[in-house]
Regions:
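Short coil/turn segments at the loop-to-beta-strand junctions that recur within blades
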Residues: 137-141, 179-180, 260-262, 360-361
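N-terminal beta-propeller domains
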Residues: 1-104, 112, 126-131, 259, ...
Length: 361
């Protein structure tokens, strides 16, 4: 008996329009309409573009923060002309990862045995060893904004647990209700160390050292919590350091009063003014225009949100048109209940130029 020949299976080519509208889960994709969106029910490892889709690119390890045992909580940058910095944080530390010599931590070994020096030290490298710029933190969920004033361009960071952090393009400073002063010194006999108490040998004045710029026998101390009056040419000393004061302390940064900066969980700028959200509340705060310090003014918003909750984020929102017929920049507040309130104007201090323009859900 002859067997029937098995015919080769064929398949027809079917063309589908590229899902330029991306992933769509709230429409029936089986129904075609003249103006229906060109989307996909499943879109994995692809990104939609205006003309088609492109495959998701891969990734490579750039840096390992600390020992690699804590997750990365935030990545943020500073960009001011040629001064470009990249920072990353864990729950305890902020690192400057602009330049990283090795993406991973490693130790030299011979087979299963690691090489150890006579002093008991391992031979190897930490990816971000020496790149710590802020340490001893309680939280790492940083919200950051870059803010320019007539005095400089700054990175302002809050996390609702630690004092506000300020990066001035060179150094980081913790900003609380205490002012920061700059004190020059010379004739150094022993180097100063941060977080120690500075004492004036003649005046008896004291202060906390928050940052040190050491140039050998001369340098600059940045101090806060000053009690008393330091004198020029007196011996100044701490547990570790000693030198001669070259002048008297000069104001460097003004602290923020009126609110504990450790309670601020969100920051943004609007009309050349910094706004903040107080964590677990419906309270917002703002600083004077063109300032990174000073007296913070409360802007309570409990009466604006009928469903209560807490403020989650705030932002500056620009519209194409306004009541004046031109571009409109609005200050927007959003709660965890999904309510949105928008304001327009110069400052909440001035009722004549500050008004509520909408509430949304």
């Amino acid at each position: 008996m002859r067997k029937a020949l098995v015919r080769q299976r064929t398949s027809a080519l079917k063309m589908f329009a590229a899902p330029t509208s991306g992933w769509i889960a709230n429409q029936n994709l089986a129904i075609s309409a003249p103006k229906s969106l060109q989307g996909a029910e499943v879109l994995e490892n692809f990104f939609p573009t205006a003309t088609g889709i492109e495959i998701r690119r891969g990734s490579s390890l750039y840096a390992t923060l600390g020992g690699g045992d804590l997750p990365v909580t935030a990545i943020f940058d500073y960009n001011n002309g040629n001064n470009k910095r990249l920072f990353a944080s864990t729950a305890t530390t902020i690192y400057d990862i602009t330049v990283v010599s090795s993406p991973m931590n490693y130790r030299l070994s011979t087979g299963s045995d690691e090489i150890i020096t006579d002093g008991g030290d391992y031979i190897g490298q930490l990816s971000t060893g020496g790149l710590e710029v802020v340490e001893g933190l309680s939280g790492g969920d940083w919200i950051v904004t870059q803010f320019a004033t007539t005095g400089g361009v700054y990175l302002v960071a809050v996390n609702g647990q630690d004092p506000m952090q300020l990066f001035d393009g060179d150094q980081w400073f913790a900003i609380d209700d205490g002012d920061i002063y700059m004190l020059l010194y010379d004739a150094e006999t022993a180097p100063f160390v941060e977080n120690e108490t500075l004492t004036g040998g003649t005046s008896g004045a004291t202060a906390s050292i928050v940052h040190v710029e050491d140039s050998g026998t001369t340098g600059v101390l940045y101090i806060t919590d000053v009690v008393g009056t330091f004198q020029n040419n007196e011996i100044i000393s701490s547990t570790s350091g000693s030198a001669t004061a070259d002048g008297t302390p000069q104001p460097y940064y003004v602290g923020i009063t009126g609110v504990d900066t450790s309670s601020l969980s969100y920051v943004w700028s609007y009309k050349n003014r910094l706004f903040f959200i107080e964590k677990e509340s419906l309270n917002s705060w703002y600083l004077p225009a063109d300032k990174i310090g000073g007296v913070a003014t409360p802007f309570p918003m409990g009466g604006e949100f009928s469903e209560g909750g807490k403020l989650l984020i705030g932002t500056s929102w620009s519209l194409d048109t306004s009541g004046d017929g031109g571009l409109s920049e609005q200050c927007v507040f959003i709660t965890d209940e999904g309510q949105v309130v928008a304001y327009q104007g110069i400052s909440p201090d001035t009722a004549a130029t500050w008004s509520r323009v909408g509430g949304y859900k």
